[in-house]
Amino acid sequence: MASSIGVLVKFNLFIQAYVPMYFDRIPELVETYNHNINSGLFDKVYLVSDADVSSIYKESDIVKNIIIKKARNFNTIFRIINMCTGEKDINVFANSDIKFDETIKLASRMKNYEAYALTRYDIYEDSDEHQLKPGMKCYGITVLSGEKR
């Protein structure tokens, strides 16, 4: 359970799940999903999609499917989170290809009702520095504390 890592808040992961148009992406998505649900970082994982994605993502005790028919925008995201969250929970809404490590627990310092948009980075082959590649679009993770109004 995520709270046993020394953090007193509950961490929920909301994955924007989908069946990819190019099936060669499926192994990457499955590996990322398995990593995140087995990491111990999240108390609950929600697969948010507009279709049944059970053919790709295996069942788990901590996973719940949420099928939505509306386009995903922040109002929809907040509505979904409010249905599933407690006032003190940390809610991470992410694309399905993002792996998390212990650094996500830094979000436990968030104040109630704060929200952050995180970016991902790459390591250049000729450097150990973590930096963004020129022209790289960076999005895919939103972290929210507590219920949203």
PLM regions and their residue ranges:
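Short, acidic, metal-binding catalytic loop of nucleotide-sugar glycosyltransferases
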Residues: L29-D43
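Short, charged/polar "capping" segments at the starts of alpha-helices
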Residues: Y22-F23, A51-Y57, Y124-D126
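Conserved catalytic core of nucleotide-sugar-dependent glycosyltransferases
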Residues: I98-R149
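N-proximal low-complexity "stem/linker" segments adjacent to membrane-targeting elements
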Residues: M1-V30
